[in-house]
Amino acid sequence: MEESPPKQKSNTKVAQHEGQQDLNTTRHMNVELKHRPKLERHLKLGMIPVVYMKQREEILYPAQSLKEENLIQNFTSLPLLQKLYPKDPENMVRKSWASCIPEEGGHMINIQDLFGPNIGTQKEPQLVIIEGAAGIGKSTLARLVKRAWKEGQLYRDHFQHVFFFSCRELAQCKKLSLAELIAQGQEVPTAPINQILSHPEKLLFILDGIDEPAWVLADQNPELCLHWSQRQPVHTLLGSLLGKSILPEAFFLLTTRTTALQKFIPSLPMPCQVEVLGFSGIERENYFYKYFANQRHAITAFMMVESNPVLLTLCEVPWVCWLVCTCLKKQMEQGRVLSLKSQTTTALCLKYPSLTIPDKHRRTQVKALCSLAAEGIWKRRTLFSESDLCKQGLDEDAVATFLKTGVLQKQASSLSYSFAHLCLQEFFAAISCILEDSEERHGNMEMDRIVETLVERYGRQNLFEAPTVRFLFGLLGKEGVKGMEKLFSCSLHGKTKLKLLWHILGKSQPHQPSCLGLLHCLYENQDMELLTHVMHDLQGTIVPGPNDIAHTVLQTNVKQLVVQTDMELMVATFCIQFYCHVRTLQLNMEKQQGYALTSPRMVLYRWTPITNASWEILFYNLKFTRNLEGLDLSGNSLRYSVVQSLCNTLRYPGCQLKTLWLVKCGLTSRYCSLLASVLSAHSSLTELYLQLNDLGDDGVRMLCEGLRNPVCNLSILWLDLSSLSAQVITELRTLEEKNPKLYIRSIWMPHMMVPTENMDEEAILTTFKQQRQESGDKPMEILGTEEDFWGPTGPVATELVDRVRNLYRVQLPMAGSYHCPSTGLHFVVTRAVTIEIEFCAWSQFLDKTPLQQSHMVVGPLFDIKAEQGAVTAVYLPHFVSLKDTEASTFDFKVAHFQEHGIVLETPDRVKPGYTVLKNPSFSPMGDVLRIIPADRHFIPITSITLIYYRLNLEEVTLHLYLVPSDCTIQKAIDDEEMKFQFVRINKPPPVDNLFIGSRYIVSGSENLEITPKELELCYRSSKEFQLFSEIYVGNMGSEIKLQIKNKKHMRLIWEALLKPGDLRPALPRIAQALKDAPSLLHFMDQHREQLVARVTSVDPLLDKLHGLVLNEESYEAVRAENTNQDKMRKLFNLSRSWSRACKDLFYQALKETHPHLVMDLLEKSGGVSLGS
């Protein structure tokens, strides 16, 4: 807490400060250049609104000026998370680590979609619950809905009448009739009551703060039909409305802090739940421009906040943002240098009265104010009469001061008073708890009585969710105690007050607490000793529940938490520092990555983008976290500045991280210099996973420089080698030879399974590192490809049986779990078994059925054959984008095409990327999703981009596809492109979800000819022609950029950089070689050595050449050789007399029998094969 400087001195300081700003023109221009264009742009677009509030409502946006504005424009950036599937009413509170996993997931929506069809239920909800933390903006949102409807901008066609009720005011009424209730909900009567009630399906009732009053809204007379003029208790009337006894067709919008509404509304139907997540990054900045009338003050204030990541994160909560702005404004008015060093909401609240309330009122009148707040909280009251104020000892002068400073507000409609915000009332109530002693007026309330009152008010389950309790923890921390002693000029007994915290913790211990609520309390307290003790206790008391996604044997090692907001992420990562049991932290998990589940870990789920401030806080905390050894950020799209901040942490001497997963993080060669600096800095890092990133040759060379440094401790590096040049791969192999401890691996394996007794589809996972240890750390060769099945013993080769039918065979050697990365298929088998897999086309089966009208294809179609009973589970891939870990199986079906017709089977489980069938029966089968036709274009899907190139004499031709992530489609495109000698270039897929039927614009660097420039994302069967854009590059002497943007919003959804080195060999040599084409070797002669060594099935090749190139005598002479290598040598010996046309026939036959070998040789040679 800063001392208030003398006024004269402070004015001098302000003058000096402003003078320095004027003199320092460079800094001043930087400020203006950074903020003025954004401000001017927002002003022109009307995106910096001044929201008008009635005097009786909470004024979080001071109205400096009033003007008409488009309210809907303000809703578009407000983060609203709609839950896909309603929660179990008995488990509506996030109670433990395990129950905090994303059971139902959700998706971001706009305010216009609140009463639209729910993706989970396909029905329009009659009841929408807006939930969220204290001060998150629920009430403001509800009022803006009413105002936007009134101005014709929202729901005007849906509702004829919208009624708004503040439940805190409604609770003051004892009895009301339905007519009186409707009259209260209207500013001005709009129609006779009979006319209003004649169309109940056109009525919307908004009940703000439904959980605030101390009532139970039970439908006590469900069979009794009351007249609209008959008066009854308010809680009974509302209970009848919500219970559908009265106006069953009406619509309702409720706002509430808690999701556990069943105890307040026993007859509550299953609602659509929408969570308000607070201000986005840009909204926090915009708020400062709304609050401060002076533009320069707004810029100065926001710059100060922006420089403090913790303070910026706290501003995610709108009421805290208001608190920060109010404190900064007071400092400006008092001539102080702007300074807010608060790290918690409690510290900010303590700052508020010290700046706004004069010294003369602090000691006595603030205590009376705290008593008023506490009485209101215990009795669920937020409105107070003048007699209530007098009863607590508040004199007129003090009340006038509190009104002037904004601590209290006077309600013009009811001549009553309230605190500026309910959270502020709860803060003062918390102070009252601490200041209480046995002689004060609250019934000789002692320590136990305080705790019992808190439990009675909030309940044991919700105790740590209550702002009053969180403020108590903050006030009883060391900094909180100092702040109160300074505010009240008194001395508090630290030991006695600490005992109160243990009483609160003890009362909740028999019941499973909300883990996130408890973490919030611990964060507010900031006491290291308390944090260490409580977090250590959590290790033994919190165990996973039935929804834990961890595998059954090891699930007690996994703690899982949903962190929807930046604030929750900051709180969780701060507290994890003191959780000694956790060894690995995983953020925003998409899939299980390739590491051991046996290592205790914490999984933080997040569906909304993470701001730079949150990344900075996370990495700062990691510097001092001694227990964490692993960090998994896979699936997060990381900006360069974020990786820069991460690498600064990894280079910090105290950082203990040993394993880092950055799979599919959008990394490019530019990032590799940062990672190389970590490898060269004597860091503790020993394992690094970088698959599914576009690092390129240049990036990997930078990594090699770091690996060569003698202080580098890295022992395992995972990369995608398929896109690297032979020269870079050789460089990596040389590094391995020089450093026996270093293992560089390709092929990303999501799991490596080890069979155990009683193993089911959730087999125990073990890491590559563990397997290496079990094998005695012997050097391992890179074996297998993405087409192989990876199992307990490593890769199992997949055999091509019939190329025309796309029929494959795999012989699984033992019991275990096997996964094929390229197809997404996953089998759990009980014994050795041979499985045949045929790629099928949906059009062969679906076109003649009505299924395509009611269901949408969401995955590939396979015809699988296996011995009955050998396969205990099959995982079938799908491309619906599910952000949660476990989705409902209600709408997903597995379609079986059998002789007698179609069978739709409900999968046992649905997870991101696949469905699970236990003890399956096999036939042509694949995933479908039950839909209504109108929703087909609103299902988020995972997509891929495919780029192919062919080198011509004067130019390069590219083919660019945007298709759903379906291996059968990719295989069909690969085959078609290979016919015309096009070679695929591997680039990362789009990060965002896309939608079937959406259109996208393809663009790129200058001098590119693109036809067509517009692509539609659609699902076409693998037998159908796939849409693509053809791109001509006249002279690719330098890199080119390709982009795909959403046509509607022109938002960038995908970007790739193509360099001349991607088209190997280098283009100048290719261009010159093509001019001398007659002198170039044919493919057959160019790759003689590799073909002799790698062609494994010579007889099928000979059969295709028999009669065309080989006569009977030559055919038998080659077959007479003993080994495949000898047969190929004999064939090449005969080929000396062949013409180019004969060699072309050999090349075509080789493509049909050994397509992957031809593709591999083409890629390594740059795709040039003349005569083919």
UniProtKB/Swiss-Prot annotation:
Tissue: Expressed in macrophages.
Superkingdom of the organism of origin: Eukaryota
Spans annotated as UPA: 923-1072
UniProt cross-references to InterPro entries, sorted A to Z: CARD (IPR001315), CARD8/ASC/NALP1_CARD (IPR033516), DEATH-like_dom_sf (IPR011029), FIIND_dom (IPR025307), LRR_dom_sf (IPR032675), NACHT_NTPase (IPR007111), NLRP_HD2 (IPR041267), NLRP_Inflammasome (IPR051249)
Post-translational modification: In contrast to allele 1 and 2, not able to mediate autocatalytic cleavage.
SMART domains: LRR_RI
GO annotation terms (biological process): innate immune response; pattern recognition receptor signaling pathway; positive regulation of inflammatory response; positive regulation of interleukin-1 beta production; protein catabolic process; pyroptotic inflammatory response; regulation of apoptotic process
GO function term, MF aspect, one: ATP binding
Residues at the site labelled Cleavage: 922-923
PROSITE patterns, A to Z: CARD (PS50209), FIIND (PS51830), NACHT (PS50837)
Residues covered by the CARD domain: 1082-1165
Pfam families tied to this protein: CARD, FIIND, NACHT, NLRC4_HD2, NOD2_WH, UPA-FIIND
GO CC annotations on file: cytoplasm; NLRP1 inflammasome complex
Region ranges (Disordered): 1-22
Intracellular or extracellular location(s): Cytoplasm, Cytosol
Residue ranges of domain NACHT in the record: 126-435
Description of how activity is regulated: In contrast to allele 1, does not undergo autocatalytic cleavage within the FIIND domain and its mode of activation remains unclear. In contrast to alleles 1 and 2, allele 3 is not activated by Val-boroPro (Talabostat, PT-100). Not activated by cleavage by B.anthracis lethal toxin (LT) endopeptidase. Not activated by metabolic inhibitors, such as 2-deoxy-D-glucose and sodium azide.
Annotated phenotype, changing residue 965 to N: Restores autocatalytic cleavage, as observed in allele 1, and produces constitutive IL1B release
Residue numbers spanned by region ZU5: 789-922
Binding site for ATP: 132-139
Protein family per UniProt: Belongs to the NLRP family.
Domain remarks in the Swiss-Prot or TrEMBL record: The FIIND (domain with function to find) region may be involved in homomerization, but not in CASP1-binding. Contrary to allele 1, allele 3 does not undergo autocatalytic cleavage in this region.
Function text: May act as the sensor component of the Nlrp1b inflammasome, which mediates inflammasome activation in response to various pathogen-associated signals, leading to subsequent pyroptosis. Inflammasomes are supramolecular complexes that assemble in the cytosol in response to pathogens and other damage-associated signals and play critical roles in innate immunity and inflammation.
Other comments on record: Three tandem Nrlp1 paralogs, Nrlp1a, Nrlp1b and Nrlp1c, have been identified. Nlrp1c is predicted to be a pseudogene. In macrophages and dendritic cells, NLRP1 inflammasome activation of CASP1 and IL1B maturation can be dampened by direct contact with activated effector and memory T-cells. This effect may be mediated by hexameric TNF ligands, such as CD40LG.
Protein name: NACHT, LRR and PYD domains-containing protein 1b allele 3
UniProt source species: Mus musculus
Highest classification ranks of the organism: Eukaryota, Metazoa, Chordata, Craniata, Vertebrata
